[in-house]
């Protein structure tokens, strides 16, 4: 039996999604909780491996099991065995053609900037603090250069293991909600650190340090060293993963919860 789950987590206390020896990971915690409920070892496959400090409201995973359990066992039962900063949002049996990573047609991220002179206290792990006068409208205009299938070498991490730098960005918008500036970006897939590297460069435009044409210039240069520093991890959320309609997976509010959809 193959089960898909929708997962939400606060990544601030973990060394990323991927299971690692001797450090705490989201995957490790989930597999441990699922194995207790299934009464057998469980291995997970995810839609997107988030880095240390990065969060998710719409992560999707799947696993194989011989255990026969009702939906409540895979949601309430698993949640009872998880730490408070990880939660299963939904569970659904899927056919063997479904794969959390390879069946996905798009991933969507939101990056939340807290734009204020003073750092936040309560939301310090859930937003990235940047002071100065950030012009979200300029960031939005500049970001449109990212649309379509392009070579994103300038925005990939040096240690990125992808065989190709090409990705297809479906949509990108930058908006302001009071003190928050939100970068919302969707693509078929993302390179390692791609979203945070894009945000880092957009911030330079929003702060008036670079012209509106800079994103297009960076794409043409194909040189990571010419782009801005990587933005902080704590404002980044994986909010949605898109799959073909045939799987009929639940669609919930994107979040994070303190933001307007």
From Swiss-Prot:
Homodimer. Belongs to the tRNA pseudouridine synthase TruA family. Keywords: Isomerase, tRNA processing. NCBIfam families: hisT_truA. Its EC number is 5.4.99.12. GO terms for molecular function: RNA binding; tRNA pseudouridine(38-40) synthase activity. GO terms for biological process: tRNA pseudouridine synthesis. It catalyses: uridine(38/39/40) in tRNA = pseudouridine(38/39/40) in tRNA. It comes from the Bacteria. The active site is at residue 51. It comes from Shewanella sp. (strain MR-7). This is tRNA pseudouridine synthase A. Gene3D superfamilies: Pseudouridine synthase I, catalytic domain, C-terminal subdomain (3.30.70.660), Pseudouridine synthase I, catalytic domain, N-terminal subdomain (3.30.70.580).
């Amino acid at each position: 039996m193959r089960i898909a789950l929708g997962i939400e987590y606060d990544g601030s206390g973990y060394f990323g999604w991927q299971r690692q020896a001797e450090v705490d990971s989201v995957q490790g915690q989930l597999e441990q909780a699922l194995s207790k409920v299934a009464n057998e070892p469980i291995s997970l496959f995810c839609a997107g491996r988030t880095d240390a400090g990065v969060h998710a409201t719409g992560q999707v995973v799947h696993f194989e099991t011989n255990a026969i359990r009702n939906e409540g066992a895979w949601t309430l039962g698993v949640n009872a065995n998880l730490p408070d900063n990880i939660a299963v949002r939904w569970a659904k049996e899927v056919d063997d053609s479904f794969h959390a990573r390879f069946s996905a047609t798009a991933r969507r991220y939101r990056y939340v900037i807290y734009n204020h002179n003073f750092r936040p206290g309560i939301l310090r792990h859930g937003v990235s603090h940047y002071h100065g006068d950030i012009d979200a409208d300029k960031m939005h205009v500049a970001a449109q250069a990212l649309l379509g299938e392009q070579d994103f070498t300038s925005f990939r991490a040096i240690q990125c293991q992808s065989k190709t730098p090409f990705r297809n960005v479906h949509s990108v918008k930058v908006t302001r909600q009071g003190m928050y500036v939100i970068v919302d970006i969707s693509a078929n897939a993302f390179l390692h650190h791609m979203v945070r590297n894009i945000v880092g460069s957009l911030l330079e435009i929003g702060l008036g340090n670079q012209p509106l044409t800079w994103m297009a210039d960076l794409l043409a240069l194909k040189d990571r060293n010419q782009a801005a520093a990587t933005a902080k991890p704590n404002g980044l959320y994986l909010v949605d993963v898109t799959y073909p309609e045939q799987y009929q997976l639940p669609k919930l509010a994107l979040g994070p919860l303190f933001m307007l959809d």
